[in-house]
Amino acid sequence: MKKEIELKFFVDDLDPVRRNLKKMKARFEGSFRESDYFFDTPQNTLKKRKAVLRLRIGDSRHFLTYKENIEKGRFKVSDEYETSFENPKVLLKIFERLGFRVWFHYAKSPREYWRCRNSLITLDSFPFGKFIEIEGGPRRIKFIARKLNLDFSR
């Protein structure tokens, strides 16, 4: 289990963020297509416990993630358990057979992964907007966000 701390920002344009990441000597780790499937029971057991069960299916890698104790304030903080797996179709079938249902699904056009100062920065583009997510310690997140000229009020 790890403690995940993250902050998301809405932006109008990803290009200035990319330029600033390069100026900061951030390391580009790649761009991957991903589809996220969120599961719960018909009784919304996980939602009631403030927990999330997510299957992330990517181009070349797949992850099963369980998050609980999700606190939403300035930073989103949660206990996160994550593991990789090989066969998404089988895992989807297992969840279905266990009585879980997909309550939300979305696909990300290539998600960009960057590393800087022991933090993970992801850039996402959806039909409804562009987002930056920074994961790390609160002070690091704030520092990186300022260097990227991200607006804390959005």
Regions found by a protein language model. Give the residues of each.
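Mixed-charge, glycine-accented linear interaction segment located at domain edges/termini
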Residues: 139-154
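Catalytic DNA-binding helix-loop module of base-excision-repair DNA glycosylases/AP lyases
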Residues: 130
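N-terminal strand-loop-strand beta-hairpin
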Residues: 1-119, 150-154
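Short amphipathic alpha-helical "recognition" segments used for binding
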Residues: 10, 137-139
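C-terminal accessory/tail domains of diverse enzymes
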Residues: 46, 121, 140-143
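A contiguous pocket-lining binding segment that forms or flanks enzyme active sites
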Residues: 123-127
